[in-house]
């Protein structure tokens, strides 16, 4: 076993700058040439090791040998972009006005489909925030023509068609309109199967692609949506093998790869830009495309400033000295900026990245590095919420505690600007519950105890950290959340409980083998097998995946139900955070090992602009 030397943090973090400050105050360093994009190679090993934190009093510890930070601070600080120039913003503003006019120029034969296509295009291109009124007007118009058989292409259509109906079902449902999936029954044949030909024409394939996308926003007990997903999935898998490589084949592959719950809006925008000219041949797609590229690159310039701020925070806080923890702050920022591109929401993006990084640091301390005595002291210190509580902590914990304390308080200050009241008590309660759940897991590891599935699952909803990653970031948004509404979003509300449960289950299916190798035996898989003697790992995974599928439908309902009084934007941000976590777990544990998918996401959505 290897000996690993760990340099402790200073007793107090070196935070000389505001942790959440206006990005306009950040002064990025400049280079005349954009540096070649690169990352450090990562060949992670997850082995049991010994380490010493004190040269006099050696302590045996478990560590995971996570690979180091892939994105050097010097490299981050050297990034530069020309897209801060006012001329780009001025051109974008002119195009916004021209695109608004496009919402009005539609004929009676296909005006319903054209309106839906316009809404879908501006959303998929990531420019919908400029057209809120136009989108609402377009969808109100479509909904006024909706009936029990769906809709046709235009207001004068006498027959409903599957393509328009499926697109409308999905789009209207995502915007909170009360539409029933029963309309899909009208597109089945006499044998109860969705009617289609054996030829697989382009029009039919597009209809089935929209049917597939609609099926992903299913609510509980919608049998027709389950049937639609099964049928369209089979159909599209066969179709994509037969048709030539084209914009249509790429859209099929993208949608089947990412679906809805793992799709990231900025990633989709980057992907869709290459195909949308072919997707909207009957509209002036060039204007939409130019606007989308300008907006992408203008936001790219803001991303660089925010990323430099975050990298300085990480460096100045002393995290680089903690060699036993994962350093994923750049990846977390990337995920945040893939779901929120509003320039006013810097505090949300930076706050999410910082909260997630703190969660990761504490996860590595509680699960592997810290001793039981140290963890008890740290848990008590969090509950005291006072810098003097660090007196009895080991040196490396003092620095971590102070970064947590100062970051949470700084974010509470940002939240006060939006909410008009002090919200620190919400945050403290969330952190206390979170740290208690970690302590319970540490006790299971120390004692070798394996809890029941239910006990592990309920505690795991809290220890996953979803509440921490959501609460303070959404409080910084420009949407007031009074106490009674906030209670419907935060744990243990139905909405938050479903999200936390889904992520705990999904995370365990990706992490349980590596966790077990580190001596962390408890997981949803092992607890299920222990509760059900004779059950195999495959049985446990099948059971958990079935649970996730059903919980996702319930979560869809909690998110999209029309009669909810919680602001849609707040629920949407909370939902989008589940999407970024899902995305990281799509192929494997992308948070312990920054795989190629995550690296490419950083490059294509943050570091590289799109060619104009």
Curated annotation (Swiss-Prot):
Q: Does the keyword Transit peptide apply?
A: yes
Q: What does the note under cofactor report? A: Binds 3 Mg(2+) or Mn(2+) ions per subunit.
- The entry's Mg(2+) 1-binding residues are 363, 367
What this protein catalyses is: (2E)-geranyl diphosphate + H2O = 1,8-cineole + diphosphate
Chain sites annotated for binding Mg(2+) 3 = 515
Transit peptide from where to where?
1-52
Recorded GO CC terms: chloroplast
Q: Which GO terms describe its biological process?
A: diterpenoid biosynthetic process; green leaf volatile biosynthetic process; monoterpenoid biosynthetic process
Q: Which domain of life is it from?
A: Eukaryota
Q: What is its EC number?
A: 4.2.3.108
Binding of Mg(2+) 2 occurs at 363, 367
Instruction: Respond yes or no to whether keyword Flavoprotein is given for this record.
Output: no
Record's keyword terms, sorted: Chloroplast, Lyase, Magnesium, Metal-binding, Plastid, Transit peptide
Q: What class of enzyme is it?
A: lyase
Q: Which cofactor does it need?
A: Mg(2+); Mn(2+)
GO MF annotations, alphabetized: 1,8-cineole synthase activity; lyase activity; magnesium ion binding; terpene synthase activity
Pathway the protein acts in: Terpene metabolism; oleoresin biosynthesis
Question: What family classification does the UniProt entry report for this protein?
Answer: Belongs to the terpene synthase family. Tpsd subfamily.
What this chain does, per the entry, is described as: Terpene synthase (TPS) involved in the biosynthesis of monoterpene natural products included in conifer oleoresin secretions and volatile emissions; these compounds contribute to biotic and abiotic stress defense against herbivores and pathogens. Catalyzes the conversion of (2E)-geranyl diphosphate (GPP) to 1,8-cineole.
Q: Any notes on this protein's domains?
A: The Asp-Asp-Xaa-Xaa-Asp/Glu (DDXXD/E) motif is important for the catalytic activity, presumably through binding to Mg(2+).
What is the name of the protein in this document? Answer: 1,8-cineole synthase, chloroplastic
Q: Which organism is it from?
A: Picea sitchensis
Q: What is the lineage of its organism?
A: Eukaryota, Viridiplantae, Streptophyta, Embryophyta, Tracheophyta
Gene name for this UniProt entry: TPS-Cin
């Amino acid at each position: 076993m290897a000996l690993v030397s760990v340099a402790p943090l200073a007793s107090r973090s070196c935070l000389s700058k505001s942790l959440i400050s206006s990005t306009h105050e950040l002064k990025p360093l400049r280079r005349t040439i954009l540096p070649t994009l690169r990352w450090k190679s990562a060949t992670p090993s997850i082995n049991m090791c010994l380490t010493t934190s004190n040269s006099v009093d050696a302590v045996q510890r478990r560590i995971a040998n996570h690979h180091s930070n892939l994105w050097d601070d010097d490299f981050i600080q050297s990034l530069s972009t020309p897209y801060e120039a006012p001329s780009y913003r001025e051109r974008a503003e002119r195009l916004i006005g021209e695109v608004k006019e496009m919402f009005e120029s539609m004929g009676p034969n296909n005006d319903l489909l054209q309106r839906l296509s316009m809404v879908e295009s501006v959303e998929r291109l990531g420019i919908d925030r400029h057209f809120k009124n136009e989108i609402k007007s377009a969808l109100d118009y479509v909904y006024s023509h909706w009936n029990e058989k769906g809709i046709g292409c235009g207001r004068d259509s006498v027959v409903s068609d599957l393509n328009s109906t499926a697109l409308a079902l999905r789009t209207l449902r995502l915007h909170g309109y009360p539409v029933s999936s029963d309309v899909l029954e009208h597109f089945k044949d006499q044998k109860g199967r969705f009617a289609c030909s054996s030829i697989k024409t382009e029009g039919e394939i597009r209809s089935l692609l929209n049917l597939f996308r609609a099926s992903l926003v299913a609510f509980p007990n919608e049998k027709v949506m389950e049937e639609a997903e099964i049928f369209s999935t089979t159909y599209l898998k066969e179709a994509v093998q037969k048709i030539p490589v084209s914009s249509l084949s790429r859209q099929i592959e993208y949608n089947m790869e990412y679906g809805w719950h793992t799709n990231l809006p900025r990633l989709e925008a980057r992907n869709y830009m290459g195909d949308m000219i072919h997707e909207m041949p009957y509209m002036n797609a060039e204007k939409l495309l130019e606007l989308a590229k300008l907006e992408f690159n203008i936001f790219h310039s803001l991303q660089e400033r925010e990323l430099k701020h975050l990298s300085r925070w990480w460096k100045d806080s002393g995290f680089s000295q903690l060699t036993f923890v994962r350093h994923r702050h750049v990846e977390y920022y990337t995920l945040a900026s893939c779901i929120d591109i509003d320039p006013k929401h810097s505090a949300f993006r930076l706050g999410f990245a910082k909260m997630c990084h703190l969660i990761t640091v504490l996860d590595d301390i509680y699960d592997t590095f810290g001793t039981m005595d140290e963890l008890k002291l740290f848990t008590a210190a969090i509950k005291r919420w006072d810098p003097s509580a660090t007196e009895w902590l080991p040196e490396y914990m003092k620095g971590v505690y102070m970064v947590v304390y100062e970051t949470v308080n700084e974010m509470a200050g940002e939240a006060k600007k939006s909410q008009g009241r002090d919200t620190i008590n919400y945050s403290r309660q969330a952190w206390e519950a979170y740290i208690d759940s970690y302590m319970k897991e540490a006790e299971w590891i120390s004692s070798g105890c394996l809890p029941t599935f239910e006990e592990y699952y309920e505690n795991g909803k809290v220890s996953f950290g979803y509440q921490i990653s959501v609460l303070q970031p959404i409080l910084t948004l420009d949407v007031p959340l009074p106490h009674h509404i906030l209670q419907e979003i935060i744990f243990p509300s139905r909405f938050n409980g479903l999200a936390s449960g889904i992520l705990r289950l999904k995370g365990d299916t990706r992490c349980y083998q590596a966790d077990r190798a580190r001596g962390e035996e408890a997981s949803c898989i092992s607890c299920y097998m222990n509760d059900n003697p004779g059950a195999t790992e495959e049985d446990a995974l099948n059971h958990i995946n079935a649970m996730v599928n059903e919980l996702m439908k319930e979560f869809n309902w909690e998110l999209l139900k029309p009669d909810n009084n919680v602001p849609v934007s707040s629920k949407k941000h909370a939902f989008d955070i589940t999407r970024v976590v899902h995305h990281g777990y799509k192929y494997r544990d992308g948070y312990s090992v920054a795989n190629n998918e995550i690296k490419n996401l950083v490059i294509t959505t943050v570091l590289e602009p799109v060619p104009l």
